[in-house]
Amino acid sequence: LLRGTVEAFLPTHEVFITDWVDARLVPISEGRFDLDDYIDYVIGMLQLLGPDVHVMAVCQPSVPVIAAIARMEAANDPHTPRSMTLMGGPIDTRVSRTEVNKLAEKRGIEWFKRNCIHKVPLPNVGFMRDVYPGFFQLAGFMAMNIDRHLEAHGEMFRHLVKGDGDSAEKHRDFYDEYLAVMDLTAEFYLQTVDKVFVKHQLPRGEMMHRDHKVDLTAIRRCGLMTVEGENDDISGVGQTQAAHGLCPNIPDALRAHWVQPKVGHYGVFNGSRFRAEIAPRIADFIATCEHLARKPARAGGKSGSSVVAFGGGRKGASRLAQD
């Protein structure tokens, strides 16, 4: 579903995107993968790509990405990215609670352990690994808007009857991507549910990475842009914007917030309104952060194009990283 996000930035930025392996394809002998590991990978990717990175985190990765940057800032890491753009992310799910948030709080973590975790079956390489199956996530998302999905399939049938192959093909292309889900390791899924949606550890200042506290007040140099959708029923309006209040030491010149009218969760990072209204604002924000970060000593050096990396972080003379 990030295909359109990448395409929007390719003409003007150097783009890198994180590539996570489906848990059912990883042998159990390879060990665990949890939220701490995710943050470690984000930090490692940013360090690999260099200090001129601009990170984009779409939805769930907003939490581990901002946590990773807080840890880097606290350590005065020279590879701290120039900016981060958090899009439709659950930074503080106590704000504008959606049905997703209410379910997590109502059920509690033990319910998710009992009902959502299963072992990978044969003949998959990850046989016997405990995972949260991708089809569970897919079923949950589709159930939230089942009428819309039924209507979309009815429209496709009507297009086929009329001989409108182009419209039907667009429908197929969308669902080819929408239905492409992967399994998550049980430990990563359960930690995310517990820390982000049940205990709200990040906004309460209680989140830990390994043995270190995640201190968002340490973020001072990295710019922060938040993007939300007016009709988002997964990450409600205000949940991502909450990051600004949690990062009080970022200068005002390095901040931006945008609520896109008339779009839901997926419209925040894909579709015509994203291309026409959101992507240009992100590009302007990246340019602003890049300009403010330049020093006179670098005036004669290479400027480079902004690099867009997706997810954990990535590269460039000026780079944008996305999850």
What kind of region is each of these model predictions?
Residues M56-Q60, G229:
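Conserved alpha/beta-hydrolase "nucleophile elbow" surrounding the catalytic nucleophile
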Residues V198-L216:
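Active-site nucleophile elbow and catalytic-triad environment of alpha/beta-hydrolase enzymes
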Residues I219-R220, T226-E228, D232:
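Short beta-strand/loop motif that positions the catalytic acidic residue
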Residues D233-Q239:
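Conserved alpha/beta-hydrolase "acid-adjacent" motif
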Residues G50-P51, P64, A68-E187:
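Alpha/beta-hydrolase-fold enzymes
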Residues L25-P27, D36-H54, V65-A70:
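Conserved acidic catalytic loop of the alpha/beta-hydrolase fold
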Residues Q260-A276:
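Catalytic histidine-centered segment of alpha/beta-hydrolase-like enzymes
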Residues L1-V26:
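Short, surface-exposed "cap/lid" segments of acyl-processing enzymes
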